[in-house]
Amino acid sequence: SDSPQAIALIFTLYAIVTVLSIFGGYLPTYFVDKLGMNPYLGRMRAMLIFACFPLLGLLAQPMGQISPWWPAIIIGLLGAGHQAWSANLYSTIGDMFPKSTIATITGIGAMAGGVGSFLINKGSGLLFTYAENKGDAFSFMGFDGKPAGYMIVFCICAVAYLIGWCIMKMLVPKYKPIVVE
């Protein structure tokens, strides 16, 4: 909608994303320069912090029943966490791989992200249609119908980054640059 409140909500959401995502790029540098951590540990600690931001998404829908400002603020924090996570994830490629492979590795990662995005969006759309058709017969965590579908998606997104961080930590438990011969 083009109402003044809707415009203010969207502005607030994007302002939060913009300001905090810039800070998200700085946090690993702070850990390295000010706390003396090695770059890998600093980046992984920052990524763990950003992976926790989406947990706030579990509150967006319930808090929306109190005021529309809460979801705007919470989703702004989620977006900032996502941006900071992504920036640091892509930076790990430059940290670990030789310059001659960075573009290829980044492209493979971006393609995987695009396919994952397509699948989550397609699955969400099917879930929303199903939930809407079932109406009150479809219930999840106190929400019925389509709102229950949205709550399911918020739950999936809330844990996806933590799962991703754990997978990355399992695949790369210690920093070791990859050498291509």
Each language-model region and where it sits:
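Interfacial helix-cap and linker-helix signal at transmembrane-aqueous boundaries
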Residues: 27-28, 32, 123-133
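Multi-pass alpha-helical transporter architecture, strongest
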Residues: 55-63, 150-181
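Transmembrane alpha-helices of Major Facilitator/SLC transporters
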Residues: 7-33, 50
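Paired intracellular helix-loop junctions of major facilitator superfamily
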Residues: 33-34, 93-102
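Transmembrane alpha-helical cores of Major Facilitator Superfamily
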Residues: 12-19, 76, 107-115
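A membrane-interface helix-boundary motif in multi-pass transporters
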Residues: 39-45, 126-159
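Loop-to-transmembrane helix entry/capping segments in MFS-fold secondary transporters
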Residues: 4-5, 99-109
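C-terminal transmembrane helical hairpin of 12-TM major facilitator-type secondary transporters
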Residues: 40-89
